[in-house]
Curated annotation (Swiss-Prot):
Pfam families found in the cross-reference section: Ribosomal_L29 (PF00831)
Keywords: Ribonucleoprotein, Ribosomal protein
Source organism, top-level taxon: Bacteria
Family: Belongs to the universal ribosomal protein uL29 family.
InterPro entries, per the entry: Ribosomal_protein_uL29, Ribosomal_uL29, Ribosomal_uL29_sf
Any GO CC annotation of this UniProt entry: cytosolic large ribosomal subunit
The protein's name in its UniProt record: Large ribosomal subunit protein uL29
Entry keyword Repressor: no
Organismal lineage: Bacteria, Pseudomonadati, Pseudomonadota, Alphaproteobacteria, Sphingomonadales
Single GO MF descriptor: structural constituent of ribosome
One Gene Ontology term from the biological process aspect of the record: translation
SS bond partners: none
Amino acid sequence: MAKTDDFKAKTDDQLAEQLGELKREAFNLRFQAATGQLEKASRVKEVRRSIARIKTVQTERARSAAK
């Protein structure tokens, strides 16, 4: 699981790319959970929180750019 500082060090393009990857992974994990094939249930929580961290960094940057 990545820390917020790791996300802050990345560019906007890198964050957008990683956000897309995490969203795809979250979809796949939800699908696995629905079909009973999920091996690590904790990964769902990690991915969800990483998505939230990326969105938080993006919002912070958007607000600081608007000032």
